[in-house]
């Protein structure tokens, strides 16, 4: 697994790098924090671990830059005790968030879960789905309707795929959380809400925000 670790605390970077490499992860860091994207584009990681507090520009800035050209999974690290940091990271398209200090074995479990759901989930499924008047391209994480195309994060696409495959049926929140993170202990209920809200916001760009209905106390439903 190719991991880009964007962490300016060299002691923590070296500790994490050593631990992750024991699990056969290939870990690369950033030398110049003014040019994070150059390392990102050259290394082409499968997962990015991104610290919030960085020199020059913060992690939120670099997350925006990465999302402009890639849906690579991003896991944020932060030493700040601020719930809004977690909300902001999800809004920007991050896949997970951990507050420092943390247990390394929990980080590894999260990375493995992210890898499974992003790179192994539904590999035998057909790669396009027809939904209402739109075409959902699972391989490109995109939705096309008329002359408009929107792009989703990996997390948003997995949520949408599950809803479409069960269209006109309620998919419970617990079912979605289990599929996304493999273990409910690794994600808050609020994280799922943020991802669904972000998905709806993107669907509104192609006039489909009402295509997903919230069933209060139960889950979500994608209309035919």
UniProtKB/Swiss-Prot annotation:
Modified-residue entries (4-aspartylphosphate), positions: 51
Pfam families linked: Response_reg (PF00072), Trans_reg_C (PF00486)
PTM remark: Phosphorylated by GraS.
Biological process terms in GO annotation: regulation of DNA-templated transcription; response to antibiotic
Taxonomy of the source species: Bacteria, Bacillati, Bacillota, Bacilli, Bacillales
Listed name of the protein: Response regulator protein GraR
GO molecular function: phosphorelay response regulator activity; transcription cis-regulatory region binding
UniProt keyword list: Activator, Antibiotic resistance, Cytoplasm, DNA-binding, Phosphoprotein, Repressor, Transcription, Transcription regulation, Two-component regulatory system, Virulence
Domain (Response regulatory): residue spans on this chain: 2-115
Domain of life: Bacteria
Compartment annotation: Cytoplasm
InterPro entries in the record: CheY-like_superfamily (IPR011006), OmpR/PhoB-type_DNA-bd (IPR001867), Sig_transdc_resp-reg_C-effctor (IPR016032), Sig_transdc_resp-reg_receiver (IPR001789), WalR-like (IPR039420), WH-like_DNA-bd_sf (IPR036388)
Chief location category: cytoplasm
One GO location term (cellular component): protein-DNA complex
Primary gene name: graR
Function summary: Member of the two-component regulatory system GraR/GraS involved in resistance against cationic antimicrobial peptides (CAMPs).
Source species of the chain: Staphylococcus epidermidis (strain ATCC 35984 / DSM 28319 / BCRC 17069 / CCUG 31568 / BM 3577 / RP62A)
DNA-binding positions: 126-224
